[in-house]
Every structure is written in structure tokens, then in C-alpha cells.
Amino acid sequence: MARSDDADSRAARWEKEAHDLSTQVAFLQEELALVRRKLTESPRQVRQLEERLAAAQAQLARLTENNERLVSTLKEARAQIVTLKEEIDRLAQPPSGYGVFLARHDDGTVDVFTGGRKLRVAVSPSLEVADLRRGQEVLLNDALNIVDAFGYERAGEVVMLKEVLAGPDGAPGDRALVVSHSDEERVVHLAETLIDAPIRAGDSLMIEPRSAYAYERIPKSEVEELVLEEVPDVDYTDIGGLHAQIEQIRDAVELPFLHADLFREHQLRPPKGILLYGPPGCGKTLIAKAVANSLAKKIAERRGEEKHTSYFLNIKGPELLNKYVGETERHIRLVFQRAREKAGEGTPVIVFFDEMDSVFRTRGSGVSSDVENTIVPQLLSEIDGVEGLENVIVIGASNREDMIDPAILRPGRLDVKIKIERPDAEAAKDIFSKYILPGLPLHPDDLAEHDSDPQATVAAMIDAVVLRMYSETEENRFLEVTYANGDKDVLYFKDFNSGAMIQNIVDRGKKMAIKEFLTSARKGMRLQHLLDACVDEFRENEDLPNTTNPDDWARISGKKGERIVYIRTLVSGGKGADAGRSIETASNTGQYL
């Protein structure tokens, strides 16, 4: 019985253990199936995880880029905010004023001129008071303290310096007396830029009227507006047909300058001035320029100098006149003051008044004004003042010397009077030789007629064209003049010839040669070109000026003597003009001959 119970219990235990083992086997089988299934699904999951990882990395890169862009935008926005804040702060600041520095004081304060007031203000610690200069522009804050310094004023009013006022010790000071365009005088301070500058009376200065400071010397002085100051390069050899006149002017000008000791020994006073008179275009201005050049060369040779210097002050006569009373006289004084300064340097100075009759007319001859009543005496006093000066001579030129005030022409002022005549045939040849040179392109046909000798060809061309100009033939008849006594006279084109007309004829001939070369490819100037140019020049001058006073016109043209009361032209076939027209009825006007 006991064994049976024990067997039953063992059987039950074994059965239970078998059941447990069966359960475990079933569980393990399920686990094994699950493991097998997982092993089967594992590669697919790996691929999915890899895909998710790649997507996450791409999203991370995008987020990183966006983050960097946002950071950059944030930095830019922060910088813009700072800039805008600075701009707002700057716009919110009170306005700063400008002033002019006047003087410094021992206590560190300075005087400035601003807003029409003179103030004593402090200077910012960032600036050195010792570095501030009189007349300098400074910046003032809202408390009117200097916070910055700049340069000098660059714009203002132009005035004429009359004189630099002396300081307490008698030396040139820091103030000047100036004259405005309205002839108003005022005293101004000189900025430090002008304290040591070489300024003189007559210079133009730029001032700032409110602060009364002069800042800058304008390079062109007032007197330079009236004269042409130059070193002439014209020589006597450049002038043709005036040998006698050149000899006269050499005796009058060069001898006193080059042999001053002989003049003093003989107690001979050198001439103060020369008057060159004659018809227009005959070389008066050219001679005056040659005088200055020749005189400078001679003086340089005597001194043993290689470089020669001379000054030719060519006065623009009509520009001397000014509507304000006394201005014309002041201009004349400035001209002679400049001449004295240049002469003081030891160089010859020629003061040349061209068209002298336009300014220095006979006193009392004015129709509507009496301006010459004060201008002429001013010139007379200046010419008399030249007596004690060295290297200065006055030369006047005019084609109406009868209209110049007699006090100017009397001995002791314009001592030497030289008439510049119209060129005769020989003088015309000499003038032509200055413009027609063997080196010019000459036509082969003309050269062939003279054995290809350029010199002979040029000489023959000049002889032929002068013969054409000066022959008293029917085609050269120009005018018939009637004098007050009833006499009549026939004038030819040669009677109105001049050096300027000869130059114009040569220029016309050269132009014709150029035009022929461009059309026919045959190069060189021919005699026919000059003859045609001569005809064209005469034809252009056949219409006289439309004046009702033929006697005045004749005087300007150089025909003086018996008074002319009537003029009629004798030219036919030119420009459609009818022969026999009187000057009073001429419809077309031309130039003075």
C-alpha cells in the first residue's frame, strides 16, 4: 500500500514535470518561431532604420542651414538697429554752427566770429589751441564751444588791394585796405595764409565780408585784365618794307638804353615816348613788339647774359574806360605801377597804347561826355613821372593822330613821331618775301619755267603779283574823290594796300593751292593762285563803309590833305555793284581799307 502511494505520487510528480517540460517545450518552440520570424524580418527593419537615419540627417542639414541663415539675418538686423540708433541719435542732436577763429588767450579760451557776433568760447580737450590759425574755420557745438577745426574759406567776394596797413612797429601788419567793385573802401584782416604772401597794391583778394577776413590772392590782378604782359618773339627781320621807320625807332629807343653814359655826357635827355601813326594794317603793333624784343637782346649782349627778357604791356584801350568816376584814372595808375615794378628788375618795359585816339581824345571834343578831361591829365602825369625811371618807354599807335590831345603829342612826352606809310612796290616785294618762301610747295609748271630753282620761282611770282597790284591800269581803278575846291583825283587799289592785305592775299593763294591739290592731285602753289587771290581781295574791298562823312573815312585810310566832300567807286562788274555809286548811297558795307 505504501509502495503504491509512493508510486502514485512519483507518477503524479513525473506527470507534472512532463507537463511542465511540455509547456516549456511549447514556449521554447514559440520563442524559436518568433526568433526565426525576427531573423527573417531583420534586414527589412535595418533598411527602414537606415532610410529613417538618412532622412533624419537630411532634415538636420536643412535645419542647420536655416539656423545659420537666421543667425546671419539676426546679426544684420542687430547691425541695422545699431546704425539706425546712431542715425536717430545724430538726427536728434542740436545743430552745430560754424565760426571763424580770431585770437587765443592765456586762460585757454579763444575768440571766434559767428552769427554776426564776436564770442569768447572754450576749446574741446581733443584740440590743441596752439594749432588754431587766424581766419581758420571752426565747428561749434550747441554750447558754442569749439569741437573741430577745418581749413580756410574758399568762396567770397573779390576786391582790389589798395595797401597793406603797417603794424605798431612800422612793419607790414595783419590788416589791409581794400576797394570793392562799388568803390567802397574797407579795412580787413589778413588770414595767416596771406601774412607772408607776396601781395601788392592792385592784386585781387578774396574776402569773406561778414568776418572781414582776406583769405586768398586771386592770381589775375586787376591790371592784368587791361594789359597783355608777354615776352615778344617778333624780330625786326620779321617786318618787311619799313626799313626807314625801323631805323628811326632804333635811334629813338635803343641808343638811349644802350649808350646811357653818352647821353648823360652830352646832356641829352632820352625820349619818353613814341607815336606810331599811319593807316591800319601797316605794322604799327608789329614794330612795337619788335622794339621790346630787340632791346632785350641788346641789353643781354652787353651784360653777357644768354637769356634775354623783356615785357610788352599791350594796353587794351577801350577796356580802360569804366562807368564809375575815377576808375579809368586808377587803371592808368595801375598800368604804370606795373611798368615801374618790371623796370625795377632791370628789364626793358614797353608800355604800348594801341588805338590811342579811342581813349586819349582831344579834351572838349566829346559829344555826350567829357571823360577825356580827366583821363588825359592822368596819362600826362604818368608820362612825366616816367622821366626818372630806367628801362621804360611809352609807345602809342593810332590811325587818327589828329584826334589825340595835343598835350600828349608835344615834345617832352611823346617826343618821337614816326609815320608808318602804306607800302610802295619795293616795300610790297619785301613783305611778300616774308610770306612766300622757297620752302613752300611750288607747282611743277612754275618751277619748270625757272630751271627748277625755287628761289628764282618765288622771286618771279612776287614780281608778277606786285606788278599786278601796283599797275595803274583800268582794272585797278578804285575811287574818284572830289575835294572841297572842286578838284578830282583817281585812286587805285595800290593806294590802299597794306601789309595785312598782302598777308591776306598770300593766305588766299595758299588756300587755293590746297583746294586744287584736293581736286586734281597736283600739288604746289602757282602764280595764278596769287593773281586770283589779288583779284578776290580787291573785289571784297570794293564796297566802302556806309558813312556820310567821306573826309573822316579818308583820314582813317591815310588820305589826308584837302578835305574830301564826295567819293564814287570806279569798279565795275564786281559783286553786282554799279559803277559811279557815291559813298552816301552805298547799301553794302565792308572793312576799312
Swiss-Prot record:
One BP term from GO: modification-dependent protein catabolic process
Keyword Signal attributed: no
Region (Docks into pockets in the proteasome alpha-ring) residue spans: 592-593
GO CC terms of this entry: proteasome complex
Renumbered residue ranges of the record's region Disordered: 574-593
Residues noted as binding ATP in the record, renumbered to the chain: 281-286
Pfam families in the cross-refs: AAA, Prot_ATP_ID_OB_C, Prot_ATP_ID_OB_N
InterPro entries registered for this protein in UniProt: AAA+_ATPase, AAA_ATPase_domain, ATPase_AAA_core, ATPase_AAA_CS, NA-bd_OB-fold, P-loop_NTPase, Prot_ATP_ID_OB_2nd, Prot_ATP_ID_OB_N
Coiled-coil parts of chain: 5-94
Polar residues: bias regions: 584-593
GO molecular function, one term: ATP hydrolysis activity
UniProtKB keywords: ATP-binding, Chaperone, Coiled coil, Nucleotide-binding, Proteasome
Keyword Nucleotide-binding: yes
The protein's annotated pathway: Protein degradation; proteasomal Pup-dependent pathway
Family stated for the protein in its record: Belongs to the AAA ATPase family.
Comment text on domains: Consists of three main regions, an N-terminal coiled-coil domain that binds to protein Pup and functions as a docking station, an interdomain involved in ARC hexamerization, and a C-terminal ATPase domain of the AAA type.
Assembly, per entry: Homohexamer. Assembles into a hexameric ring structure that caps the 20S proteasome core. Strongly interacts with the prokaryotic ubiquitin-like protein Pup through a hydrophobic interface; the interacting region of ARC lies in its N-terminal coiled-coil domain. There is one Pup binding site per ARC hexamer ring. Upon ATP-binding, the C-terminus of ARC interacts with the alpha-rings of the proteasome core, possibly by binding to the intersubunit pockets.
HAMAP family: ARC_ATPase
Role summary: ATPase which is responsible for recognizing, binding, unfolding and translocation of pupylated proteins into the bacterial 20S proteasome core particle. May be essential for opening the gate of the 20S proteasome via an interaction with its C-terminus, thereby allowing substrate entry and access to the site of proteolysis. Thus, the C-termini of the proteasomal ATPase may function like a 'key in a lock' to induce gate opening and therefore regulate proteolysis.
Protein name, entry field: Proteasome-associated ATPase
Annotated source species: Salinispora tropica (strain ATCC BAA-916 / DSM 44818 / JCM 13857 / NBRC 105044 / CNB-440)
